[in-house]
């Protein structure tokens, strides 16, 4: 059941890409506001909002900022954001999924298409690459929360599909239908996770050479630094040495 986290070295770059806290907090606040607007403003009754609040806490976003983002959803003068998923191919034919929340669809599409084109890739139609990914739930805990065996046993009992434990922590995967129940069971045992969300997990990853990898990592940077982009997923692996070289 346990295994290697094939795309972890790409996900690790997210921390560096969002090094500017003001930009990161803006993205987190946007997700909180949208989640609260689509459901109830009570995180205990709104799974998406709870996931957004957990993500904000994990980045040490001040409590006042979180509460302000929730209250913003209750007002009538707040911005309206569209949720859009972009799909395309990066350098080397690598599949890329981009999730965005934008108040200007034309601007977002133009910018993201430009990023793909400049990197030597191309933006495709919705559905053009998502078939190579699985929509799945992920619950993450720090390494120190419990032993690998303890986490594995608890995850199996809770109904998880897979567990990956390593130096970076524990990752528990569950179906889209069951992950909230799994997260609730694990939280009762280990406390609040550092992450609980739905993601696009690549079914397989491809190892790329350093030249292609550098182009791909630059594309990841461009996408993640855009204000409208919330999440980026791709199905490639690069060497740890390249990630370190580029400051990941």
UniProtKB/Swiss-Prot annotation:
One short Pfam name that applies is TACO1_YebC_N
**SUPFAM superfamilies found in the cross-reference section:** YebC-like (SSF75625)
Q: Does the UniProt entry include the keyword Repressor?
A: no
Where mainly found?
A: cytoplasm
* Gene3D superfamilies per record: 1.10.10.200, 3.30.70.980
Coiled-coil annotation: which residues? none
Its annotated compartments are: Cytoplasm
**Chain residue ranges for the region called Disordered:** 1-21
Q: Name one GO molecular function term.
A: DNA binding
Q: Is this entry keyworded Nucleotide-binding?
A: no
Q: Which domain of life is it from?
A: Bacteria
Q: InterPro entries, alphabetically?
A: Integrase-like_N (IPR017856), TACO1_YebC-like_2nd/3rd_dom (IPR048300), TACO1_YebC_N (IPR049083), Transcrip_reg_TACO1-like (IPR002876), Transcrip_reg_TACO1-like_dom3 (IPR026564), YebC-like (IPR029072)
Which keywords does this Swiss-Prot/TrEMBL entry list?
Cytoplasm, DNA-binding, Transcription, Transcription regulation
Q: Name one GO biological process term.
A: regulation of DNA-templated transcription
This protein's GO CC annotations: cytosol
Q: Which HAMAP family match?
A: Transcrip_reg_TACO1
Q: What family is this? A: Belongs to the TACO1 family.
Q: What is this protein called?
A: Probable transcriptional regulatory protein blr1534
């Amino acid at each position: 059941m346990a295994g290697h986290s094939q795309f972890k070295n790409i996900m690790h770059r997210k921390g560096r890409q969002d090094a500017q806290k003001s930009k990161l907090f803006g993205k987190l606040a946007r997700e909180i506001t949208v989640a609260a607007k689509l459901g109830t403003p009570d995180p205990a009754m709104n799974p998406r909002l709870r996931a957004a609040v957990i993500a904000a806490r994990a980045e040490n976003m001040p409590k006042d900022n979180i509460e302000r983002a929730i209250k913003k959803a209750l007002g009538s003068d707040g911005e309206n954001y569209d949720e859009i998923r972009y799909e395309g191919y990066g350098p080397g034919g690598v599949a890329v999924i981009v999730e965005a929340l934008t108040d200007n669809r034309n601007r977002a599409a133009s910018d993201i298409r430009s990023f793909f084109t400049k990197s030597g890739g191309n933006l495709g139609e919705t559905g053009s690459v998502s078939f190579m990914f699985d929509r799945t739930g992920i619950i993450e805990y720090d390494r120190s929360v419990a032993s690998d065996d303890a986490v594995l046993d608890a995850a199996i009992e809770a109904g998880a599909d897979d567990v990956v434990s390593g130096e970076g922590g524990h990752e528990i995967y569950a179906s889209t239908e069951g992950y909230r129940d799994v997260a609730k069971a694990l939280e009762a045992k280990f406390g609040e996770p550092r992450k609980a969300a739905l993601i696009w997990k690549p079914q397989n990853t491809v190892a790329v050479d350093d030249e292609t990898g550098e182009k791909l990592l630059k594309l990841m940077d461009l996408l993640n630094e855009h204000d409208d982009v919330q999440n980026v997923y791709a199905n490639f692996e690069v060497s740890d040495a390249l990630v370190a070289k580029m400051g990941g």
